[in-house]
Every structure is written in structure tokens, then in C-alpha cells.
Amino acid sequence: MNAALDDKAAKKAAFEGNKLAKRLRHHVGDAINDFNMIEEGDRVMVCLSGGKDSYTLLDILRGLQKSAPINFSIVAVNLDQKQPGFPEHVLPEYLKSIGVEYRIVEEDTYSIVKRLVPEGKTTCSLCSRLRRGILYRVADELGATKIALGHHRDDILHTLFLNMFYGGKMKAMPPKLVSDDGRHMVIRPLAYCREKDIIRYADWKAFPIIPCNLCGSQPNLQRQVVKEMVNDWDKRFPGRVESMFRALQNVVPSHLADPKLFDFVGLQTGDAPFADGDTAFDKEEFRDPAPDADDVEDAPKKRTISILDSRGKESGCGA
């Protein structure tokens, strides 16, 4: 009896895990296609920290690599910043076991950060800048044409609210960007993926997670407050987070207040219809949006399947 129950539970777990993997693959494939993140012949450097996000990113990209209509290579890179207690053996052992090309870069940024940042203050900002410079250098050494980071949809929304609340800017975290010096292309293939899906996926795959608090830095309190706020909205108003993310993809500059984005000064009347006109007076149909279809359907939406299955071989990456 117990054996039968265990077998049934195992089959159910496998079914749910495969469904989750399929959803994440479609979300990643969608983002890659929508933003032209990966092209024929690209060498993608996946930045691997040892956390759930970067493990998931590497795993999903390797799966897409096998079925994509284009050819691209992957090299995983981990920056060992010499934090006390960092388990140096974990990532090399894992990467060898899955047979992926990798490089471990050893740079003692931990000592630099501890020397420059007062005790008790968050070190994340300086640490991030130092890490970014090193990764750009390594990308050059490896001949990488794309640098893939593990930021997901929730990270993008959190950054939007942080900039609004504390920086006075309508600015989020782009799915694709060029570095300040114009020489490196950074991509975020998990841009459409929900953190809660990534957490479940990492647990299902049993990745050897390395804790992110080894440096002893205090967490970014502002980011934590924003994260808790968004998570609360997600629980109380299902579908609202999806709606907020869609807003980032449906910007109407003529109905904001930035004269750098829209020529309010030069606005003139005329006889011809004006596309950016009085839509502000359209009937309001505000309501709580429906939850993400992923929560109520087993399969991805037809739109997603169409994008992944019908694009030409010369473009993008499919599942």
C-alpha cells in the first residue's frame, strides 16, 4: 500500500515538474524571441552565482540549445570573490557532472569591499560594480558575444518601484542592454519568469544551492520592503503583478509628463486625427485583471506556442 502511494506521489511530482519546466522554457523562449537576445553563432556567457536563478537560467538555456533552430554555445562563469566559507568545490563538481564548459574566476573583491564599506552597511552596490567590471573582462577573454544574467520578472518589477519610490524615475531593469562602454551585450532571458516558479524548479531539480549571505552584508532594506509589498499584492489581488509587468510593455509617452519623451511644447491642433490625442477621456474599464494563465492552464498560451514554433531559422531561439 505504501509503495503504491509513494509511486503515485512520485508520478505526480514528475508530472508537475515537467509541466513547470515546459512553462519556464516557453517563457525563456518568448523573451529570447521578443528581444532578439540570442542569434546564430552567439557564444553566451552564463553568469553562475550558485543561487536558484542562475542555476535555472543555465539549465533552461542548455535545454533550449538542444532544440533551437539556431546554433549557439554556452560557457558558465563563476566569480569566486573569496568570501569566508564559500564552498569552492560545489560549482566545479556540478558543472563537470553536467558536461558544460566553464571557468571559475578568483578575485578577492571581498577584502576590497570590507575595507571600503563601513561595518553594518550594505555592500551590495560596490560589490556589484566590482563584479560587473570583472565579468566584462572575462567575457572578452572568452570571446563571449552575450552575457546572460539570472534576473527574473519579479526583479524587474522591484527595480521599477525602487526607482519610483526612492529615485524619482520611471526606470526598471531592461531585458537586454549594452554596457556603458558599448562593447558588451547583456541579456536577461528569465525576464518573463516568475520567482515562485524558479523557486519550485530549483527545488525540483535539487540544484546544489550556495547561500547568498556568505559575505555577511546587511540586506538591502528598501528592496526587501518593495518585495514584500509586491508579494502581498500578488496574494491579495491575483493577476495584478502580471498586469503591472504588461504596463512596462505598453508605455504611452504622450500621457506621461516627460518632455524628453514627448514634444508637449510643440503640440499643435489641426484638421487631421491625432493618434496620441484625447485617449485620456476614454471610458475607464479598470478592474482586477485575471490571474496569469499559467495558474489555470496546463499548457502555455497559443500565442507563445506560435512564436516558438513558427519563427524562421534565422531568428531567435525556440523551445
Swiss-Prot record:
Recorded GO CC terms: cytoplasm
Compartments, as annotated in UniProt: Cytoplasm
Cofactor note: Binds 1 [4Fe-4S] cluster per subunit. The cluster is chelated by three Cys residues, the fourth Fe has a free coordination site that may bind a sulfur atom transferred from the persulfide of IscS.
Cofactor list: Mg(2+); [4Fe-4S] cluster
Protein keywords: 4Fe-4S, ATP-binding, Cytoplasm, Iron, Iron-sulfur, Magnesium, Metal-binding, Nucleotide-binding, RNA-binding, Transferase, tRNA processing, tRNA-binding
A GO molecular-function descriptor: sulfurtransferase activity
Sequence ranges of Basic and acidic residues compositional bias: 280-290, 310-319
EC number: 2.8.1.-
Keyword RNA-binding attached: yes
One Gene Ontology biological process: tRNA thio-modification
Region (Disordered): 276-319
Associated pathway: tRNA modification
4Fe-4S among keywords: yes
Reaction(s) this enzyme catalyzes, per UniProt: cytidine(32) in tRNA + S-sulfanyl-L-cysteinyl-[cysteine desulfurase] + AH2 + ATP = 2-thiocytidine(32) in tRNA + L-cysteinyl-[cysteine desulfurase] + A + AMP + diphosphate + H(+)
UniProt-annotated binding residues for [4Fe-4S] cluster: 124, 127, 215
HAMAP family in the record: TtcA (MF_01850)
Biological role stated in the UniProt entry: Catalyzes the ATP-dependent 2-thiolation of cytidine in position 32 of tRNA, to form 2-thiocytidine (s(2)C32). The sulfur atoms are provided by the cysteine/cysteine desulfurase (IscS) system.
Family, as annotated: Belongs to the TtcA family.
Subunit structure, as described in the record: Homodimer.
Other notes: The thiolation reaction likely consists of two steps: a first activation step by ATP to form an adenylated intermediate of the target base of tRNA, and a second nucleophilic substitution step of the sulfur (S) atom supplied by the hydrosulfide attached to the Fe-S cluster.
Protein name: tRNA-cytidine(32) 2-sulfurtransferase
Organism annotation: Chromobacterium violaceum (strain ATCC 12472 / DSM 30191 / JCM 1249 / CCUG 213 / NBRC 12614 / NCIMB 9131 / NCTC 9757 / MK)
